[in-house]
Every structure is written in C-alpha cells, then in structure tokens.
C-alpha cells in the first residue's frame, strides 16, 4: 500500500517537480555563466571583490525558484484531491491515516529537497574552483533560507488546499505569506545565520498544520 501511495503522489507531482528542477538547473547555469563572463573579462579577483564589497553572491536569479517549486508541488498534490473529491476516499483506504498523510508529505518534501540539493551542488561545484571555502560557505548559507521557505510554502499550500472552511483558508494563507515573507526580509548575505536552525525546525513543524486540516476535513468542518 505504501508503494502505491508514493507512486500515486509521484504521478501527480512529477510534472511540476521536473519543470522546477529544469528551471533551477537553468538558472544555476545562468548564474555560473555570469560569473564566468566576469572572470574572463576582469579576472577572478574582480568576482571576489564583487562578492565581498557589494554582497553579490551571484545567486540572485535563484531566489524565488524554490518557493515556486514548493507552492507548485503542494497545489499539484492536494488540489486534484479536493477538486475531484477524492480525498475522502483516500482517507478511507485500508491504511493508517497518519502514515498515509506522512507518506504524501514525504513525497512532496523529498522533491523540494531534491531540487534544493541539485541547485546547491551545481553552484558549489563551480564556486569551489574559483572561490575560497569561506566564500562558498557564504553562498550556501545565503541560499539556505530560500530552501526553508520552499518547505514552509509547501506545507502551508497543502494545509490550505485541504482546509474546508473559507475563513480558515484565509487565515492559513495570510499566516503562510507572513512566515514566508519573513524568510526573504533579510537582504544581506547570511542574514539568517543566527536563526537558520530554528527556521529549519519550525518549517518541519508546519507539517502539523496539514494534519490539522486533515482532522478538520475528516470531522466535516467545512463550509
């Protein structure tokens, strides 16, 4: 049953996942080409100068892609269940409800993590050729809040889709926008170093909101 659930979720989300992965790879490649062009024309030293003096990590075009992937996967996964009224049937399958929801969320989370890891690896592999380890670390830490925001957006999107009460949908949406906006509020590189671990833990706890929406749906708390 578990394999069937995972396969079903993969079928629903693979299109969004592959598009998001392709877009991330393309944007990472674009940033690498930008760095390579600057290095070819003005030398690697100029890249270091830009990164240290102007706080330009050459990853700006990647800022909102993980967020879009998180929202897209959440919609692709949960919206068809609700629009086609399949979710109630899903909850009545001969399998633990909590494990089923966990499996569904695990698939979405794995896809978001995969996009984040692939993007990071592409950037890091190139940067390690021309930058000091300290600068490479700075680039990764600058991107990390964007990946956390993707996880937060995914869980909130899933929770909003499942929630059956309009007022609760609006409240969850506003809360989600507020939390995600907070993760993009810092303009400087490594702006969230001191609280990054806290945000990672908080992002995973957002999965509880999905369970809350599932419980309310099962109890018939809908408009």
Go through each PLM region and give its residues.
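Short, well-structured alpha-helical interface segments that form or flank functional binding sites
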Residues: 1, 84-85, 155
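Alpha-helical transmembrane segments of multi-pass membrane proteins
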Residues: 7, 11-19, 98-115
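Helix-loop-helix units of permease transmembrane domains in multi-pass membrane transporters
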Residues: 78-107
